[in-house]
Amino acid sequence: MKCKPNQTRTYDPEGFKKRAACLCFRSEREDEVLLVSSSRYPDRWIVPGGGMEPEEEPGGAAVREVYEEAGVKGKLGRLLGVFEQNQDRKHRTYVYVLTVTELLEDWEDSVSIGRKREWFKVEDAIKVLQCHKPVHAEYLEKLKLGGSPTNGNSMAPSSPDSDP
């Protein structure tokens, strides 16, 4: 566990930062997804999510993060997958599906850092995310294709006779 000025970072036994995120959909059809502006690069879009707090369950962390970053409440659905990122940072992110039931007019990150949110068709969101956050595009590709992620490593169990 490491402390940042405004949060505590938690790590799993393998040294991965524990994160949670949600693909927030306008309806159960899952054809329009909500993205938020990056705090670091306000002209770029990302999937809302962030670090898990000590003793916090992944689903609870995902709901808290989308409330803080996107100003939405909703019905938490299935766990889409657990994605690892090893390139620039060691992250392990639990990604859930959430159907939005309420959009707040003002929310924590809109007031404090001017964060924006916008609905995208899934295909458009994938294109937007591939430039800046390819691992986030991967979440939607897995959802759309029902397959395994390609850039990060999915933590789906593999059979003993598969190639490493």
UniProtKB/Swiss-Prot annotation:
UniProtKB keywords = Cytoplasm, Hydrolase, Magnesium, Manganese, Metal-binding
User: What is the uppermost EC class here?
Assistant: hydrolase
Q: Where in the cell is it found?
A: Cytoplasm
User: What binding details are noted for the cofactor?
Assistant: Binds 3 Mg(2+) or Mn(2+) ions per subunit. Mn(2+) may be the true cofactor in vivo.
Motif Nudix box extends across 50-71
Q: Which GO terms describe its cellular component?
A: cytoplasm; cytosol; nucleus
Residues that, per the record, bind substrate:
R9, K17, K18, R19, S38, S39, R40, R89, K90, H91, R115, K133
Q: Where is the composition biased (Polar residues)?
A: 148-164
Region Disordered, as annotated, extends over 144-164
Query: How does pH shape activity?
Result: Optimum pH is 8.5.
What is one process in the GO biological process aspect for this record? adenosine 5'-(hexahydrogen pentaphosphate) catabolic process
What are the residue boundaries of the Nudix hydrolase domain, all occurrences included? 17-144
Q: Please give the tissue specificity annotation from the record for this chain.
A: Mainly expressed in testis and, at lower level in brain. According to PubMed:12121577, it is also expressed in pancreas and weakly expressed in thymus, prostate, ovary, lung, small intestine and heart.
Q: Does the keyword Electron transport apply?
A: no
- Residues reported in the UniProt entry to bind Mg(2+) 3: E65
Primary place of residence? cytoplasm
Cysteine-cysteine disulfides:
none
- Example GO molecular function: diphosphoinositol-polyphosphate diphosphatase activity
UniProt lists the family membership as follows:
Belongs to the Nudix hydrolase family. DIPP subfamily.
Q: What does this protein do?
A: Cleaves a beta-phosphate from the diphosphate groups in PP-InsP5 (diphosphoinositol pentakisphosphate), suggesting that it may play a role in signal transduction. Also able to catalyze the hydrolysis of dinucleoside oligophosphates, with Ap6A and Ap5A being the preferred substrates. The major reaction products are ADP and p4a from Ap6A and ADP and ATP from Ap5A. Also able to hydrolyze 5-phosphoribose 1-diphosphate.
> What name does UniProt use for this protein?
Diphosphoinositol polyphosphate phosphohydrolase 3-beta
Q: Which organism is it from?
A: Homo sapiens
